[in-house]
Amino acid sequence: MGWGVGPASELASRRAGVDTFVYGLSRDDGLFYPSKVGLMFGEDRQPETELAAYWRVSQNLHSLLDRGLDPLSVLIDRSHEKGMDFIASLRMGAVPGIGRPELTVANGGEGYVHPEVRSHQLAVLEELSNDYDIDGLELDFTAAPGGSGLSFPLGTGPTNAPLMTELVRSVSSTIRARGGQLGVRVCTTPALPASLSLDCCPGLA
């Protein structure tokens, strides 16, 4: 059960006044939960033939699934038991499970210019919002998943920024439709979208 209870319990036991647990649940090569719309880490390969750390992650995920437990739900529940809000953080440059890797910037595609990429990422965010008892979503534009954090090809950001704005508006609509209180964090500083040639923050309006 270390996968689910360890990080949350450790933070709470330090008595440091921590009241929020932000969990990065994706890499370029997979999501750390059994997604119905995306790719779970390790599903498309054999992690035991790679780094020991990858094997450990895959084994931890499957050890819970084999017992009928959802790894993400376990972590969320433990955070709530310890009095912490749970924020699900998604790397926006990663689209594991899209089925067409050639659409990503890392593989020569145009990233979020493609409707398929935007639809896929929105489906993952809707799944997190509707299927899990999270307290907030973080749209992480800063972490580089597997070495590529680009949403659009270099030099095309200003032209394509409205596409990202519309995607964030769609996320906002999903959050409002869910009801209750669910926070969304898009960027860590006001300067970040400008540095990435994105105009994403107005999408929350």
Predicted regions and their residues:
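Short, solvent-exposed turn/loop segments enriched in Gly/Ser/Thr/Pro and often Arg
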Residues: 24-29, 90-95, 140-145, 188
